[in-house]
Amino acid sequence: MDVYSPTWFGLFMDAIDAAQTAREVEFLARQLPLPRHVRVLDVCCGTGRHAAMLVERGYDVMGIDVNERAIAQARSALAGRATLLIHDMRRIEQLDGSFDLVLMLWQSFGQFDDATNLDVLRQIARKLAPGDRFILDIYHRGFFETRLGTRAHEKLGRTITESKRLADDRLVVELDYGDGTGDRFEWRVFTPDEIAGLARQLGLHEVLRCAEFDEAVSPSPDRARMQLVFEKC
């Protein structure tokens, strides 16, 4: 499983502005109208940036993440307004109860081998009743097929060297922070049809695919991420 370092959080996650999160939550709310979808499971919730805004809108949120630093930050920010647990997504079935909605945002899916990735989806499907929804925000494989190699860029005054390569269907990203530290991440990456087909096997019917958290924007190899909304049959 990928483990995000404190340096990564400081450079990439903590730097996300509230306006971006608000746009993403507006999309989620359009796809999850209250009161039909109230109880939300936010898988890999990170620092709770989506959970906080969803709670403000009246959703009952449980967030899980394996990163203790992220959960501690989320608990501090939400101050008891959501249930936030240090919990592995591979054990979703151990969580109490069911949910009206499961979220998996910010390229959190695909960290494991194909069998384990499928089992994570299977556990999510089992936590949903017919008519409940699952929203997935992941990388579009086509985007990275033409953007591999090594480049250096500036982020918050630091020079980061980023290397990307594809190994079969897996994207490998290595970050060098220039101070002897770095991060390495690896994910199975999909086309829209591939991930929709995988979900279909588990009784999750696709109701929307888009990009930029905008229903009017279609997924494209020109855009790094895509969002898919599934409904339990």
Where are these regions (language model features)?
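Conserved class I S-adenosyl-L-methionine
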Residues: 1-38
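Class I SAM-dependent methyltransferase "Motif I" SAM/SAH-binding loop
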Residues: 44-46
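Class I SAM-dependent methyltransferase SAM/SAH-binding core
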Residues: 49-91
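A short acidic, Gly/Pro-enriched loop at the edge of an enzyme's catalytic core
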Residues: 94-101
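Residues lining the SAM
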Residues: 105-106
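SAM-dependent methyltransferase
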Residues: 115, 131, 135-198
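A short glycine-rich, Lys/Arg-flanked "PGG" loop and its adjoining helix->strand segment in the class I
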Residues: 118-130
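C-terminal lobe and adjacent flexible extensions of AdoMet/dcAdoMet transferase-like proteins
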Residues: 194-233
